[in-house]
Structures are given as C-alpha cells and as structure tokens.
C-alpha cells in the first residue's frame, strides 16, 4: 500500500467507524488531512473503491486481532486490553453490522466473525466453565455479540465499561445454567 493512500485510509477508517459510509465526505477529509481532494481521486478514483480498500484494511486488522485473542489467557484483563487497543476496529465492525443490507458488508461481517469469534468463544467457555451444549454456547454467543455491538460507542470502549459488561455477561450466562 502506497504511503499516499495511508493517511486517507487511516482517517477514512476512523470516520467510517464513527459515522458509517455516509460520513465519508471527501472534501471534509481532505481539509482534515491538509491535502487536496484530488489526491483522494488519484489514489481511489471514487468512494466505492475507497470503501473496498477500507473493507480490506479492516480484514487485515481483524487477522491481527484474532492472533492476539488466540493468545489471551483471560477475559479480564487480557481480552479487554486487546479490545481497547483495537477500539476503532470494533467501531468499524459495528457500522458494518448496522448496514448489513449491503452484500459486501455482510461478507466482511461473516469473515470477521470467523476470524475473531472462535478464539473469543473458546476463552469465554473456558473462563465461564459453562455446561452448555455447543449449539447453546453458539446461540448465547451470537446474542451476546449482537448486544455488545448495540451498546459500544467511542466513549465507552474502555477498561471499566468492558469489565462491567463482561461481568454482567458472566452473571447472565451463569443464571441460564
């Protein structure tokens, strides 16, 4: 990836994470970056191609998250540290989930679930020591994941909130046993 693209991708990624595709205003982003908007069109041609680059960048970031999650030994603090470190990636994924009416977004959400979901589920099952069938664990995780993405925002993705969230999730899961 060329250096000229990286500032656009970094700002675009964060902007998409906060506002979705509708927030990708080229002129406003050019002003923030202090470069001409013609630079954007030189690198990406149009917003659709730019979003494709952002989706690819997101998948690359999720591969890194998956490796880190696979090495985590606990939810608190290890997994929470990872989630805080990759805050913008979670928020980007949240926007994709909210716009699942677009086929390209659905594909990326499904791929990210495969990448990051498995390591997280294994850690969660180990730490909670649940006596659930694999089907029940998968269903509970799916609900928890949807709930998680509905609740997160740029202000609450920090250690305190995440710790409380996972404690509550643990309490709910134990109540279902």
For the regions a protein language model found, what residue spans apply to each?
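Short, Lys/Arg-enriched anionic-surface-contact patches
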Residues: 1-5
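Helix-turn-helix
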Residues: 7, 11, 15-49, 53
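Solvent-exposed, amphipathic alpha-helical segments
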Residues: 11-19, 61-69, 143-151
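Basic/polar phosphate-binding segments, predominantly the helix-turn-helix DNA-binding elements
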Residues: 32-35, 43, 90-99
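Alpha-helical DNA-contacting segments of helix-turn-helix folds
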Residues: 44, 50-58, 109-112, 116
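Hydrophobic alpha-helical connector segments
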Residues: 53, 64-92
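A structural signal for repeat-array scaffolds
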Residues: 92, 153-154
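Amphipathic alpha-helical packing segments from all-alpha helical-bundle domains
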Residues: 101-142, 149, 156, 160-170
């Amino acid at each position: 990836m060329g250096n000229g693209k990286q500032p656009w991708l970094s700002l675009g990624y964060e902007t998409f994470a906060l506002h979705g595709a509708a927030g990708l205003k080229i002129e406003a982003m050019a002003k923030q970056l202090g470069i001409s908007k013609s630079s954007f069109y030189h690198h990406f041609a149009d917003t659709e191609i730019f979003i494709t680059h952002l989706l690819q960048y997101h998948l690359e970031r999720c591969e890194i998250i998956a490796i880190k999650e696979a090495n985590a030994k606990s939810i608190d603090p290890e997994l929470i540290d990872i989630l805080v470190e990759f805050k913008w990636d979670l928020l980007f994924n949240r926007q994709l989930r909210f716009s699942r009416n677009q086929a390209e977004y659905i594909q990326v959400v499904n791929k990210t679930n495969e990448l990051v979901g498995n390591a997280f589920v294994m850690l969660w099952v180990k730490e909670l020591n649940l006596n659930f069938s694999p089907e029940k664990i998968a269903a509970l995780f799916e609900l928890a994941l949807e709930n998680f993405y509905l609740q997160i925002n740029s202000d609450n993705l920090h250690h305190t909130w995440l710790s409380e969230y996972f404690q509550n999730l643990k309490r709910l899961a134990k109540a279902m046993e």
